[in-house]
Amino acid sequence: MEQVSQSAFYRWLRKGRIVSQAFFFLLFVFLFVKTDYTGSDSIEYAVNILFRIDPLLALSTMLAVKTIIILMLPALLVMVFSLVLGRSFCGWLCPMGGLLDGWRRLFGRVRKNEATRFPSLPAILLIFILISAIFGVPLAGYLDPFSILVRGLSQAIYPGLNEVTVSFFTFTYQHLPEALNRIVEPVYSFLRYTILPFEQKFYQFGLVSLFVLGLVVAAEYVQQRFFCRNLCPLGALLGWCSRVGLLAMSGGDESCGACRHCARICRMGAIDEQRKIDAETCILCLDCFEQCPRQIISFAGVLPISRGAGTSLSRRRFLTTASASLVLPTVLGVRTLNVQADPLLIRPPGALAEPEFLNRCVRCGQCMQVCITNGLQPVMLRAGIEGMFSPYLVARTGYCEFNCTLCGQVCPTGALQILGMAEKHQFKIGHAWFDKNRCLPFAKGIPCIVCEEHCPTPEKAIKFRNSEVVDEQGLRRQVRQPFIDDALCIGCGICETRCPLPGRS
């Protein structure tokens, strides 16, 4: 009777895990959707909490900046959680894990489980990331599962969803009878109010982010939880904590005979042929317990000495990884001091000095997602290899709104400081200049005051002086030519955004 009640308890516990995974994935989606302009100058929800509880981002960022980042201290809770319940975060809470499990359930095919292809690679990548961070090369954001997920969603899938939805309802509005439109219109209004973004956005390297996320999902057809088992450095870090976890799954014994059904169905490949469960890899999904024919697998307190061997790195691999991490800045030239900064690399308002900004930026893409004007874009090689996917302002796409401070509010690491409105109005992110070979009053003698009309500074950073020019007909005429008041210009870029000429002006 006791065994039956215990069996029922674990079955309900497994169902609870599925509910937990679904709940936290939906919570992630909710916070993702709320990382957008909603008509308010402040963000109502802790939309950056996912990145603030990420131990990989927290540890690597603090190592890079050599200080404690208060914003990221919640990550300690996940570390403590892993010390008690092992790597259960990956099976119960992680939205990337929820996406992969849901994708396989809906679109995957059932196949025999296989041994993990590259069991040591996540630990190698983790060591490489942490040592590189110490020497000023931030790499965690490139492989962190949360950064990959949010970048792919915000820079490709979400804008694509909005484009398809708006196009569909525009088509129905134009072609359906008025009676049907009365039914369709409330549906669109509901989607616009609850799910769709404030405006249609486009990201110049969005397909790159989509490609990376697509590879992670497509790898499910190679092996279940391929990314989690073979690449994820966050999983490796939580796995290290799991080595001393107080609770874990306890595997079968010799009385199981030749069954080994648990090893064949384990989504993480955490059970070996001797039915020993590796706590460093096990995510406590409880599949093995539910499907064990003899109900011999249990969940209980386990001493570290009784655990599976886990994944260990040889001394040679460790030294090779450490050496590569040390020479990376020199070999790749990612931190050469004699390279002049690109004048067109304009960081968002509140950005710290470039070296510390790059060390703190985790490439989450939330500042770009929340940008009202779509002016913030991901940079590729313009900022060097270490600066890929970090944000910069492309004024031809959108300007920095004078009364907006949302990007600093969503930044999880403090790479972008939270500015008060008075500070924002004075914060200089760049400097405007005129291409006199193209600007209409200079190049063609045609009057134009568009840039000055849109300048948001109270005293107008763009001013005019009367000049005599020769127009295209060879006639002399007086034209007001613009110039920049350096003391007033904050580099918001609206003058370039609104300029009637195409291209750089």
What is each residue range found by the language model?
Residues M1-R275, E280-T281, L286-S505:
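Non-ligating segments of multi-cofactor redox enzymes
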